[in-house]
Regions:
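Conserved beta-strand/loop scaffold segments within soluble protein domains that form the structured core
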Residues: 1-157, 161-164, 178, 184-211, ...
C-alpha cells in the first residue's frame, strides 16, 4: 500500500473521506515551512475491515499559526486506524492539534491509536494538543497520547561529547524526530522530496519544493510530475 502525500496550504477547505469495506489508505499530511495553515479533516471508516494509516508533520517558525483538527470515525466493526502527528515549532509560532477518535456502538473489534508529539524550539513558541476518545463499543483496543517538550538534553550532551557542534547536534535530533513521519512515505521519490524539505527547514532555508507551496490555499497532493 503506497502512502499518499498531501500538502496543507493556508485556509484549506475541510476534507471528508469515506473508507468502504476492506479499503486501506495510507496518508501523510505536510504543513511546509513558511506556511500558516488550518485544516479540518474527517475520515469515516464505514465498511467492515477498513484500515487507515494517517501521519502528519508541521514545521513552523516566526509568527506562523498551524491548526489541525482531525476526526476519525469508526462506524463499522473490525476496522483499524493509526495516527501519528509530529510538529517542530520555533520563534513565536503557535500550533494546535485537536484529534478525536469516535467509535460507534456497532463498531466492535475496533483498533484505533492516536499520538501527537511537538518540539518547542524557543521560549516564545506555543503548542497545545487535545487528543480525545469517544467510545460507545465495549470490545475495542484504543489509545491516545500527546507530548509537548524540548530536545533531549542527554542526547544533545552525548552528541557534543562526540565532537558534534551544538547547532549540528540540534539539527540531527530534530531530523530524527521528524524522520519517523518521513519514513511513512513508501514511494522513494516522494520520501526523498519530503526529507529534503525537512532538512532545508532545519538549516533555516526553504528549498524550491517548499517555496512553491506557500501561496496555495488548498490541500493538494505531491506527485512525481511536479
Amino acid at each position: 500500500m503506497d502512502s499518499e502525500v498531501y500538502v496543507i496550504g493556508r485556509d484549506a477547505v475541510p476534507q471528508f473521506l469515506r473508507l468502504d469495506a476492506g479499503e486501506a489508505r495510507s496518508m501523510t499530511l505536510v504543513v511546509p515551512p513558511g506556511t500558516s495553515a488550518r485544516l479540518g479533516l474527517e475520515i469515516d471508516l464505514c465498511g467492515p475491515g477498513a484500515s487507515l494509516d494517517l501521519a502528519g508533520v508541521y514545521l513552523c517558525n516566526d509568527a506562523e499559526r498551524v491548526d489541525l483538527r482531525v476526526l476519525v470515525r469508526h462506524s463499522s466493526g473490525g476496522c483499524t486506524s493509526r495516527q501519528l502527528f509530529k510538529g517542530i515549532v520555533g520563534g513565536t509560532a503557535r500550533a494546535a492539534f485537536d484529534g478525536l477518535i469516535y467509535v460507534a456502538q456497532d463498531a466492535q473489534k475496533t483498533q484505533a491509536y492516536q499520538e501527537n508529539h511537538t518540539l518547542l524550539l524557543s521560549g516564545t513558541a506555543f503548542a497545545e494538543s487535545r487528543p480525545q476518545l469517544e467510545i460507545y463499543a465495549d470490545d475495542v483496543q484504543c489509545s491516545h497520547g500527546a507530548t509537548v517538550g524540548q530536545l533531549d538534553e542527554e542526547a544533545l550532551y552525548y552528541l557534543r561529547t562526540r565532537g558534534i557542534g551544538e547547532a549540528a547536534a540540534n539539527r540531527l535530533l530534530m531530523f530524527a524526530f521528524a524522520n519517523e513521519i518521513v519514513q511513512n512515505v513508501t514511494i522513494e521519490a516522494l520520501r526523498d522530496r519530503l526529507s529534503n524539505m525537512v532538512q532545508h527547514r532545519l538549516h533555516g532555508e526553504l528549498n524550491v519544493c517548499a517555496q512553491c507551496m506557500l501561496n496555495n490555499n488548498i490541500v493538494f497532493p505531491i506527485t512525481l510530475e511536479e
